[in-house]
Amino acid sequence: MVDCPRYSLSGVAASFLFVLLTIKHPDDFRVVGPNLPILAKVGEDALLTCQLLPKRTTAHMEVRWYRSDPDMPVIMYRDGAEVTGLPMEGYGGRAEWMEDSTEEGSVALKIRQVQPSDDGQYWCRFQEGDYWRETSVLLQVAALGSSPNIHVEGLGEGEVQLVCTSRGWFPEPEVHWEGIWGEKLMSFSENHVPGEDGLFYVEDTLMVRNDSVETISCFIYSHGLRETQEATIALSERLQTELASVSVIGHSQPSPVQVGENIELTCHLSPQTDAQNLEVRWLRSRYYPAVHVYANGTHVAGEQMVEYKGRTSLVTDAIHEGKLTLQIHNARTSDEGQYRCLFGKDGVYQEARVDVQVMAVGSTPRITREVLKDGGMQLRCTSDGWFPRPHVQWRDRDGKTMPSFSEAFQQGSQELFQVETLLLVTNGSMVNVTCSISLPLGQEKTARFPLSGW
């Protein structure tokens, strides 16, 4: 008989479990990326990297770079070859797989001609079979905008406004004003607007007294690039003479126009001054983009608002007298509101403001009736194609107002109002009920419904 050493069953089981826990799964790995964000300027290329640990070949793995959804990769490789037809929208032709050192598990994504929309987090995922690990890489996109331009607009009553403008920034920059001794000055208004390309246009306004002799500076700072653009203006050099020498006159009353017709905005210099060598800008709320810009004898198309492209023309017959008329063709409801007409030279402007009222007279009302179960009657008056929102009123045969049961207004794609109003009638002796729909400027359409024989 052979004697065997005594081992407890529980001890054997514990030892076996320990061995299992200390043996790594054959697919066990992790992924690491850069500790700091990757900074890239708009228009340049960005290189994002990640590393498989422990280091080993990725030849038989699936590797993908993606933003938020793994099923929509920026780029993906499987078994050493790119999987085509999958690039996320916006990255076609710009995302490139870089052969960094795939034998050691190092991969890289190059994004060409970086855009503002590329800013943000990316994920690098390695997958082998059903086992995967990933890490995130932060791409910070930045763009240094243009040198600021400070222009002066005269407001009268001892005050002027300084407007600091610049374009081409990303992300949104920080803007501040300083006086001659470096003291901070508070902005009157700030507008930082992203353009179609994702870059920010900056427009900050400062109010000052026009008898000031200070030098004032506008600073625009990029936190991402840690760089500043600045501009300085000495108020005493311009305001005493140029702003006081001329004023701009516009319409004193709002200009009403119907949808589809042409809007005419006329403004002129007083006293009469030849404006051929001046810059003239028609604006809405901001300096840029503009409704229409005239400079150096021609229209500056590159500064025009998208919604006005192809719809404006300039009448310059009296430009030698300082008079110009802007025509806005095919008026829309969105054209309603205030416009600013600026005449300027060398960054000094005077302005006038003109209000435009856009209206649309709708269809002739249509009245239909419905007999109710209780013996009463409900009249429904409908019409469409109105702007602005019209006033609706029911009147009896003597012209007295009758309270409506309900009123409903809906706006369609062109912002025109559709009207529906209900009237409950219980008095069978009532005849000649009128539905009236009118605009604030007095335009009115009516329909009459004779209530007889019921």
From Swiss-Prot:
Glycosylation-annotated residues: N210, N296, N427, N432
Q: Recite the UniProt keywords alphabetically.
A: Disulfide bond, Glycoprotein, Immunoglobulin domain, Membrane, Repeat, Signal-anchor, Transmembrane, Transmembrane helix
Provide the Ig-like V-type domain boundaries: 27-140, 148-234, 244-355, 365-452
Extracellular-facing ranges = 24-454
Q: Cross-referenced CDD domains, in alphabetical order? A: IgV_MOG_like
Q: Which PROSITE patterns match?
A: IG_LIKE (PS50835)
The UniProt GO MF terms for this protein read: signaling receptor binding
Q: What is one GO biological process annotated to this record? A: positive regulation of interleukin-2 production
Report the family membership.
Belongs to the immunoglobulin superfamily. BTN/MOG family.
This protein is called Butyrophilin-like protein 2
The record lists the organism as Mus musculus
Gene name of the record = Btnl2
